[in-house]
Amino acid sequence: MKNRWKILAFGVFFVAISGICFAQVGPATMKAGTYTWVAGGMGGGWYTVAGGFARLVNQKEPRINIKVIPGGGVSNPIQLSQGEADIAWGVGYVDKAAYNGLGPIYDKPYKNIASIAGTLAVDYYHFLAAKDQGITTLDQFVAKVKRGEKIRIAAPMTGTSEYVMTSFVLQYYGISYDKIKQNGGTVIQAIYGDMPSLFEDRHVDYAFTCVGLPAAIVTEMSIARSAILLELSDEIINYCAKTYGTVELSSGLCKVPGGTYAGMPNDIQTLCHSTEILVSPKMPDDVVYVITKILCENKDFLVQLGAGYKVFDPKKAGLTVQVPLHPGALKYYKEVGYIK
């Protein structure tokens, strides 16, 4: 009887040990460590997804512990570069600006950053206009400004990445938010939560935002007042992709599908930027390899955390980053044949 219990106990012990071994994705020589992931605001999408993915990584590789802390798209590359974090969410074009020291976002380059995957999710620039303004394209909006018409617009807040990008777009056309003001128009910089009431109550006739699809605030505005998203030309989308690192037109992602919002039955071409995951170049190659592997082999899990991650394509993830790939990530992509 005692021998039977010994055999049973040994069997349980063996299964337990086997389970631990199977749980390890990384090589036996990989050292255990705790890493800090700077995400977005607490309770927001970035923060929530980072927390969920951190738990998945730890389940599959117990030697990797990830602590998630609040952050933001503009500040994350700085914190990463200065050694205050090991992993960070990033906005593709913002990361490129940080790496190159592009003003007005950054006053110097932050080179101590790397990436493991690009285009995890996409946010869309919504150039919304009231239908009574009689236009359907951004080119027509620009023409109004150049004619000196008094435009009333709700714009993103200074300091946000979307304020910078919409400013770059206007600059491409030779106009600016200041030009709108000089014409006697109104530029109200507002948080997104305030834009619907400004639009509905006719304090503004236009609203510029950058959000995922479908955007609740745009839905609210388009229901409260007949509206249209202004279509952007191939030229401006290609220019921003080449110059700043926004999503390329050839990706097929630069459109808001018809039916997303009330009164807009057709696809509307627009500018969009992508999300990527950054890491410190100092992170061990084997740790980054494991994180990249878990990320690329668990897309369904990401989509459960957020529907916006449906656009994530592991086969292209290593090719759409805006800063250099970490060697550990590159090793994974080469191993599976995604990068030759």
Predicted feature descriptions by range:
Residues 92-94, 103, 115, 133, ...:
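Pocket-lining segment of extracytoplasmic ligand-binding domains
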Residues 141-146, 246-302:
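Bilobed periplasmic-binding protein/Venus flytrap-like ligand-binding cleft at the lobe interface
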Residues 49-56, 67-108, 193-198, 213-222:
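Pocket-flanking alpha-helical
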Residues 93, 98-123, 128-138:
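Signal peptide-directed extracytoplasmic domains
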Residues 120-124, 148, 271-272:
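Short, solvent-exposed loop/turn segments at the edges of secondary structure
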Residues 1-33:
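Short, low-complexity disordered leader/linker segments with a strong preference
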Residues 206, 211-223, 229, 272, ...:
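An extracytoplasmic/periplasmic, membrane-proximal ligand-sensing/linker region
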